[in-house]
A protein has these predicted regions:
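Hydrophobic alpha-helical connector segments
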Residues: 83, 94-126, 196
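Short hydrophobic/aromatic patch on the recognition helix
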Residues: 64-74
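Basic, helix-initiating cap at the start of DNA-binding domains
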Residues: 1-49, 53-62, 79-82
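Alpha-helical DNA-contacting segments of helix-turn-helix folds
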Residues: 81-88, 127, 131
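Hydrophobic/aromatic-rich alpha-helical bundle segments in the mid-to-C-terminal region
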Residues: 131-143, 147, 157-206, 210
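Hydrophobic/aromatic residues within well-ordered alpha-helical segments
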Residues: 77, 84, 88, 92, ...
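Short amphipathic alpha-helical elements of helix-turn-helix/winged-helix folds
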Residues: 41-45, 95, 123, 175
């Protein structure tokens, strides 16, 4: 999705192909090694500390690289979190485009929307600290991934004949906001299964499917 820049270049229209890691220019061995060290260190930091408090100095020290090396790749900790999320989000995007139903093509739109919710919640459950570090506040709406999700949900709404699909898109993506999921799981004590069942029910109600 990127070469260390702030956000990925994702397809945000059905006619464009995803830019996957396999299509990116090959890195030099030392650059690839540094990137791997940075991401491995960041994975640990984001999973053990408050993402909002992580600094570039901490990341550089944990990765065993110089500050200049870190800043050449990433402008801030949020960009590092984005890089860690990229691989997981690419896989979900690939499944939406060409995977088996109901996540991929071939199922009714309500079932596909429900499957998307379940997959996205699973992603949040596994990588919530990263999501909180990368996709909270206004940054969520400008991310390439959010643009991709918007196009996908809109296509399902149109297929399902939902009136005024453009007004529904962001309302339907709101349950997947990392801050909301964190509140539901860690403040309200809701299980991931309970949240998933609720949003799957919402998907089918919107599409008027039983």
């Amino acid at each position: 999705m990127h070469n260390g820049q702030h956000r990925r270049d994702l397809a945000i229209s059905p006619g464009r192909a995803l830019s996957t890691p396999q299509t990116q220019p090959r890195e030099r061995a030392d650059a690839a090694r540094n990137r791997a060290q940075i991401l491995a260190a960041a994975e640990h930091l984001f999973s053990t500390q408050d993402p909002a408090g992580i600094t570039m100095d901490q990341l550089a020290k944990a990765a065993g690289v110089g500050r200049a090396t870190l800043y050449r790749r990433f402008p801030d900790p949020a960009a590092v979190a984005v890089a860690l999320l990229d691989e997981h989000e690419y896989r979900l995007q690939d499944q939406l485009l060409s995977g088996p139903p109901p996540l991929g093509p071939g199922a009714p739109p309500g079932d596909r929307l429900a499957a998307f919710y379940l997959a996205a919640i699973d992603l949040l459950e596994q990588h919530l600290p990263l999501a909180l570090g990368a996709e909270t506040g206004p940054a969520r709406f400008t991310s390439g991934a959010y643009g991709f999700w918007r196009v996908h949900v809109r296509a399902l709404l149109v297929e399902g004949g939902v009136p005024d699909p453009d007004a529904h898109i962001d309302l339907l993506l709101a349950p997947l906001a990392p801050e909301l999921y964190d509140f539901q799981r860690n403040r309200m004590g809701l299980s991931s299964l309970r949240i998933a069942a609720c949003v799957a029910d919402l998907a089918r109600r919107i599409m008027r499917q039983p």
